[in-house]
Amino acid sequence: MLKDFIKNTNILNILLAYSGGIDSTFLLYQLLKLKKNNLNFTFRAIHINHQLHPDSEKWSDHCKKICINHNIPIIIKKITINSNKNRIEEIARKKRYQAIYKIIKPKEVLATGHNLNDQCETMLLALKRGSGITGLSSMSYKLNTIYKIKIVRPLLKISREDIKTWIYKHKIHWIEDTSNNDTKHDRNFLRLNIIPKLKNRWPYFEKNCSRSIEILNIEKKILKQEIKKKLNKYLVLNSILNISNFRYIDKNICSIILRHWIKINQNTMPTFKIVKEIYNKVIFSKIDSQPKIIIKNYQIRRYNNHLYWTKKIPRIENIILIWNNTQKKLTLPFQLGNIVQNDFGTTLPHPNNNETINIRFYTSHKVLITKNTKHKKLKTIFKEYKLPPWYRKKIPLIFYNNKFICALGLFVSNTHKKSNNEKNLKLSWISSIHNIIV
């Protein structure tokens, strides 16, 4: 089965997630067996030491010893988890993938030892959470991506009982984590207390769960294609959604579009509670209001019949940046991008010898735009450009000393007189925000 899996998925380079437990140990020896049979692929192992168990160091030593004995390259990586005990599994998982992401090579695929029983447990946990088709479809047997890591789970159709039988038959040593018997963890509770009763009543329960998951994955794939078509009708940029017609669309379709739009921006599916809140408090709030919903470090805001996904940043209107050398890029604060000199930028006159280029994000002075005869406040000009209010004080304003020159990428003031025989200066603002506002 494993041989066919590797051939069918055309995997050439494998990074094995090797905990030393029975499943990853079984997978390691199966990969070794295939290598000895001259199957064309390379593999190495990674062991993540979570430092949560008194025997963590012994487990690392065991994995290292096994790999050395079989000439398997191995990386031992320690991670530190200091956080809420109620979320320890979730946090450990995230940190584990972050550590792997830093180590995995571009053409490598991560292989894990998840088996048929794990798949059933995952489905039941999704039921407990009230998940939809995405959660209930559980783990994918085929190649997919998590945290930007390509991952395969070749043992998902092999039961834990079959793995144990093979391990005992070949007298192979593995690590038994005593915490696996602690039923305060939901997965252990299901495995030890619930699933045995279900199997006693229905012996093929786990295999039927696996079949249901396969069906759900097929349906999810078709549904995903249809949702993508719907979403693309309203997507302006990944961070901007046109909601002008949402009042005339079925509420359930709107909710699905919203969920998948948020997933594009935060990589995880939002809860139905959050989607409902966005639908009621943002989309259908008063026309003249500026509603927002906060999701972690981000905000969802509405302006001019559009939803915006934007990062929260501190107030920066009092910041002044001096730019003495335009040959070098100037990095703006809070990941607002860079200002560079290039051939594609906004054309500006060179500053005079006694003038210093400085960048600000606010001015109370009225300004005069090129080809305009009336001085206006920036606030008024930004309104004319239909810029969302929260973006207006993120736009770099170029000053020569205290004289306003331009709002970079938008407009230039015509109040600055160019010195004779001076070449123009061309400046560009390189930023994802710039793509949004112009």
Curated annotation (Swiss-Prot):
Keywords: ATP-binding, Cytoplasm, Ligase, Nucleotide-binding, tRNA processing. Gene3D superfamilies: 1.20.59.20, HUPs. The keyword ATP-binding applies. GO terms for biological process: tRNA modification. One of its GO terms (cellular component) is cytoplasm. SMART domains: TilS_C. It catalyses: cytidine(34) in tRNA(Ile2) + L-lysine + ATP = lysidine(34) in tRNA(Ile2) + AMP + diphosphate + H(+). Its EC number is 6.3.4.19. It holds the Pfam family TilS. ATP binds at residues 19-24. It is found in: Cytoplasm. Ligates lysine onto the cytidine present at position 34 of the AUA codon-specific tRNA(Ile) that contains the anticodon CAU, in an ATP-dependent manner. Cytidine is converted to lysidine, thus changing the amino acid specificity of the tRNA from methionine to isoleucine. The N-terminal region contains the highly conserved SGGXDS motif, predicted to be a P-loop motif involved in ATP binding. Belongs to the tRNA(Ile)-lysidine synthase family. NCBIfam families: lysidine_TilS_C, lysidine_TilS_N. This is tRNA(Ile)-lysidine synthase. The lineage of its organism: Bacteria, Pseudomonadati, Pseudomonadota, Gammaproteobacteria, Enterobacterales.
